[in-house]
Amino acid sequence: MKSVQFCFLFCCWRATCCRSCELTNITITVEKEECSFCISINTTWCAGYCYTRDLVYRDPARPNIQKTCTFKELVYETVRVPGCAHRADSLHTYPVATACHCGKCDSGSTDCTVRGLGPSYCSFSDIRE
C-alpha cells in the first residue's frame, strides 16, 4: 500500500513541478532594412523539458539520441511590415507551432544548436507593436 501511495505522490510531484514539452507564447522581432521599420509579433513555440541521457561510453547497439522539445505540427503565418519603400517586399513569413513533442531534433528544418536566434530587439529607433 505504501508503494502505491509513493507512486501516486511522485506522479503528482512530477506533474506539478516538472514542465513537460508544451506550447508557449513568445515574441519575435521583425525588421527589414528596406522598410526602416520594426514590429514585434506574438506567436507560439515549443518549450519545456524532455527526458534524455548522455551515455559515458559509446555503444553501437544503442545509439545515443538526445531528445529535445520541438514542434510536432507547424503552420506559417505572414505579416506585412509597414513603412516599406515602393516595390520593396513588405511581407514576412514566420513559423507558428501548433503541437509539440519530445523527439530527435531535425537539423533539416530546425536550428539544433544551443545558441539562440540572436537579439530580440529592434535596431531601428521606431518600434511598433
UniProtKB/Swiss-Prot annotation:
Q: Where is the signal peptide?
A: 1-18
Cystines in this chain: C21-C69, C35-C84, C38-C122, C46-C100, C50-C102, C105-C112
SMART domains membership: GHB
Q: Where does the UniProt annotation locate this protein?
A: Secreted
- One example GO MF annotation: follicle-stimulating hormone activity
Query: What InterPro entries does the entry give?
Result: Cystine-knot_cytokine, Glyco_hormone_CN, Gonadotropin_bsu, Gonadotropin_bsu_CS
Tell me which GO cellular component terms the UniProt record holds.
Answer: cytoplasm; extracellular space; follicle-stimulating hormone complex
Give the domain of life. Eukaryota
What binding partners and quaternary form does the record give? Heterodimer. The active follitropin is a heterodimer composed of an alpha chain/CGA shared with other hormones and a unique beta chain/FSHB shown here.
Q: Which PANTHER family match?
A: FOLLITROPIN SUBUNIT BETA, GLYCOPROTEIN HORMONE BETA CHAIN
Give the family from UniProt.
Answer: Belongs to the glycoprotein hormones subunit beta family.
* Function noted in UniProt: Together with the alpha chain CGA constitutes follitropin, the follicle-stimulating hormone, and provides its biological specificity to the hormone heterodimer. Binds FSHR, a G protein-coupled receptor, on target cells to activate downstream signaling pathways. Follitropin is involved in follicle development and spermatogenesis in reproductive organs.
Write down what this protein is called.
Answer: Follitropin subunit beta
Q: What is the lineage of its organism?
A: Eukaryota, Metazoa, Chordata, Craniata, Vertebrata
